[in-house]
Curated annotation (Swiss-Prot):
Source species: Saccharolobus islandicus (strain L.S.2.15 / Lassen #1) (Sulfolobus islandicus)
Protein's UniProt name: Large ribosomal subunit protein eL34
Record's keyword annotation contains Chloroplast: no
GO cellular component: ribonucleoprotein complex; ribosome
HAMAP family registered for this protein in UniProt: Ribosomal_eL34
Length: 85
């Protein structure tokens, strides 16, 4: 039976075949999905995905309006549309 900490389904199970022929289970953290732009769904650049607690606020996302939510091209379109209204 695995330790209580390893029973969590938030850990990914990897079955590894050992030289003896037996299989062992290795546990590792699941990787988060890449963050995407809310308008065009393209991957966002400059946005960290894993282990966010290790980074400061400025390292997690770009420091501009809608940073970490919209890509730069969609933001430019949005600003142009707001100015032209």
């Amino acid at each position: 039976m695995p330790r209580p900490a390893l029973r969590s389904r938030s850990l990914r199970r990897i079955y590894v075949k050992l030289p003896s022929g037996k299989t062992a289970i290795h546990y590792e953290r699941k990787k988060n999905d890449i963050s995407k732009c809310a308008m065009c769904k393209k991957p966002l650049h400059g946005v960290k995905t894993n282990f966010l607690h290790k980074y400061g606020k400025s390292e997690k996302r770009p420091e501009r309006p809608f940073g970490g939510y919209l890509c730069s091209s969609c933001l430019a379109q949005l600003i142009k549309a707001m100015v032209r209204q």
